[in-house]
């Protein structure tokens, strides 16, 4: 099949003006939310400068932190006077409650609400609001002063505590409203040595968040290959006027859990202390995610397509029409692909059979988080459909649909991978998860028990995940401006029951499945996806 080298997958786009208006309205609504919280701040301290808590400037505390930082106490250790805590497992992290003098966090929040301009950051890894770098915000007097405190007081103090050479600091403000999140990453980039988060939540009754409100800093352990593993090992809830910092390394995996409260935004000042090139950076850049397992067609199984497929897709004229559409657009969606009774039987079995079917969580956590079926436990209609996708009959059909050499005398050694996935709240895949196509590939995506907003797949142009832009201050990859994001998106697949999506993607094309927010309605239960890839 011939495809355009400039457009591996041709997208169906919305009107840009319409998208822009909707985004502006949504952004205005959400950015305006913190302003209403100003009324609940109470009396705001009139101050011209940010002052560190004197308790953290005492030599005795510095010495205690130095000792605690180097000790290997997995359960952590706590200082009685300040409540400072240090944990070494799964990596070194320190919590300093009451970092600034009383009333300072209120004054900072008031200035943030009144003066900070927010930019919406939205990609596979994150959704939240971010300010400019504090060094570029001269109108924000207290924030500028906070940056100076980090530079002149906190940086040399951290050098003593951590025994690391720290040259400079970068910082910005982040705001997470309900539904926002930042998925698993390690912060490891070039010269980052120590990451920090200063929490701002001075609202009465919300000084320390509960687990039900979300927004926790969630810490992950990792395996022998430095891949983060489920479940979350430690949670640190937002707490007003608390300063957290940790050593950036090949195991410093963490995420910001989805904010689930509409009452308050999660506000922080966050960034990094930088030094020499991080020693762990080179090794991390060579770490590869696991790849899909490709198998040859199942020669023992050749099910009659007429028992399963909608009869319209067996007609020669329909096949030729599909082939022409795929040749022109590199994709097509075939509605009501299977006979309705087969689809209903399969969906019912997936929802009801909790004893026989065995599922396992698919990791590592910095690549993906969803469940996959142990195919050896498949029975009944589910087994029949899975066998069909790997059968010679399906390879023959896909040859007719696409003109690819997946069957016949010109076929050399065609292969496929078949996976049955289960998607619920909190599930995702991210860019760079091993699903970048290293050669031309035909993807099939089939939904059962579909729900709007769950298991939505986005295809991006080659190299779209690595634009030449500045690094974000609360994530691992580069920022995207609106134009770059829009132009890089080739196709978005939205869930539709009993619809087979066929996508031909060229070498270098990548994809991700958007994080399933807790706000996504899943009243009918989880969404199931049969995901297949075929190679000539």
Curated annotation (Swiss-Prot):
<dbReference type="InterPro" id="IPR051842">
    <property type="entry name" value="uS12_prolyl_hydroxylase"/>
</dbReference>
<dbReference type="Pfam" id="PF10637">
    <property type="entry name" value="Ofd1_CTDD"/>
</dbReference>
<feature type="region of interest" description="Disordered">
    <location>
        <begin position="467"/>
        <end position="486"/>
    </location>
</feature>
<feature type="domain" description="Fe2OG dioxygenase">
    <location>
        <begin position="165"/>
        <end position="275"/>
    </location>
</feature>
<protein>
    <recommendedName>
        <fullName>Prolyl 3-hydroxylase sudestada1</fullName>
        <ecNumber>1.14.11.-</ecNumber>
    </recommendedName>
</protein>
<feature type="binding site">
    <location>
        <position position="254"/>
    </location>
    <ligand>
        <name>Fe cation</name>
    </ligand>
</feature>
<keyword id="KW-0847">Vitamin C</keyword>
<dbReference type="InterPro" id="IPR006620">
    <property type="entry name" value="Pro_4_hyd_alph"/>
</dbReference>
<keyword id="KW-0539">Nucleus</keyword>
<feature type="binding site">
    <location>
        <position position="187"/>
    </location>
    <ligand>
        <name>Fe cation</name>
    </ligand>
</feature>
<dbReference type="GO" id="GO:0031543">
    <property type="term" value="F:peptidyl-proline dioxygenase activity"/>
</dbReference>
<dbReference type="GO" id="GO:0005506">
    <property type="term" value="F:iron ion binding"/>
</dbReference>
<dbReference type="GO" id="GO:0031418">
    <property type="term" value="F:L-ascorbic acid binding"/>
</dbReference>
<keyword id="KW-0963">Cytoplasm</keyword>
<keyword id="KW-0560">Oxidoreductase</keyword>
<dbReference type="Pfam" id="PF13661">
    <property type="entry name" value="2OG-FeII_Oxy_4"/>
</dbReference>
<dbReference type="InterPro" id="IPR005123">
    <property type="entry name" value="Oxoglu/Fe-dep_dioxygenase_dom"/>
</dbReference>
<comment type="function">
    <text>Prolyl 3-hydroxylase that catalyzes 3-hydroxylation of 'Pro-62' of small ribosomal subunit uS12 (RpS23), thereby regulating protein translation termination efficiency.</text>
</comment>
<feature type="compositionally biased region" description="Basic and acidic residues">
    <location>
        <begin position="14"/>
        <end position="24"/>
    </location>
</feature>
<feature type="binding site">
    <location>
        <position position="185"/>
    </location>
    <ligand>
        <name>Fe cation</name>
    </ligand>
</feature>
<comment type="subunit">
    <text>Monomer.</text>
</comment>
<dbReference type="InterPro" id="IPR039558">
    <property type="entry name" value="TPA1/OFD1_N"/>
</dbReference>
<keyword id="KW-0408">Iron</keyword>
<keyword id="KW-0479">Metal-binding</keyword>
<feature type="binding site">
    <location>
        <position position="266"/>
    </location>
    <ligand>
        <name>2-oxoglutarate</name>
    </ligand>
</feature>
<dbReference type="GO" id="GO:0006449">
    <property type="term" value="P:regulation of translational termination"/>
</dbReference>
<dbReference type="GO" id="GO:0005737">
    <property type="term" value="C:cytoplasm"/>
</dbReference>
<dbReference type="InterPro" id="IPR019601">
    <property type="entry name" value="Oxoglutarate/Fe-dep_Oase_C"/>
</dbReference>
<feature type="binding site">
    <location>
        <position position="199"/>
    </location>
    <ligand>
        <name>2-oxoglutarate</name>
    </ligand>
</feature>
<dbReference type="GO" id="GO:0005634">
    <property type="term" value="C:nucleus"/>
</dbReference>
<comment type="similarity">
    <text>Belongs to the TPA1 family.</text>
</comment>
<dbReference type="GO" id="GO:0018126">
    <property type="term" value="P:protein hydroxylation"/>
</dbReference>
<dbReference type="GO" id="GO:0006417">
    <property type="term" value="P:regulation of translation"/>
</dbReference>
<feature type="region of interest" description="Disordered">
    <location>
        <begin position="1"/>
        <end position="35"/>
    </location>
</feature>
<keyword id="KW-0223">Dioxygenase</keyword>
